[in-house]
């Protein structure tokens, strides 16, 4: 899988390791938040999807997949997004999320980065 083939709203299975501290770790699904122009560089801005993330859920930095119609379950933890080389990490595409769910995630990212 080439990183430039990733589309905003795609879900991939990928290893997030190595990590440090309280970063979400392990092999898990991630949601691509970056647009196709950014992804052309071979990397993508992604947010991990987890069954945990209780702090982020309470704080409002996570978006649940419940009721979205996706096979992937859990919550997109926007507060832990990072840029990854999808090809180097052998990412496997699983599915894509509906536009309204992607919009919710992008709104959370905007809230995090607003000044």
Regions found by a protein language model. Give the residues of each.
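Conserved functional hotspots at enzyme active or ligand-binding sites that engage polyanionic ligands
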Residues: 1-115
């Amino acid at each position: 899988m080439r990183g430039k083939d990733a589309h905003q709203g795609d879900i991939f299975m990928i290893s997030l390791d190595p990590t440090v501290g309280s970063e979400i770790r392990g092999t898990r699904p991630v949601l691509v938040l970056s647009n196709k122009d950014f992804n052309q560089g071979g990397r993508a801005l992604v947010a991990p999807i987890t069954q945990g993330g209780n702090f982020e859920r309470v704080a409002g930095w996570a978006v649940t997949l419940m009721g979205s119609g996706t096979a992937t379950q859990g919550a997109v933890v926007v507060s832990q997004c990072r840029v990854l080389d999808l090809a180097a990490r052998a990412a496997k595409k699983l599915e894509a999320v509906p536009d309204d769910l992607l919009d919710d995630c992008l709104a959370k990212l905007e809230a995090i980065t607003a000044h």
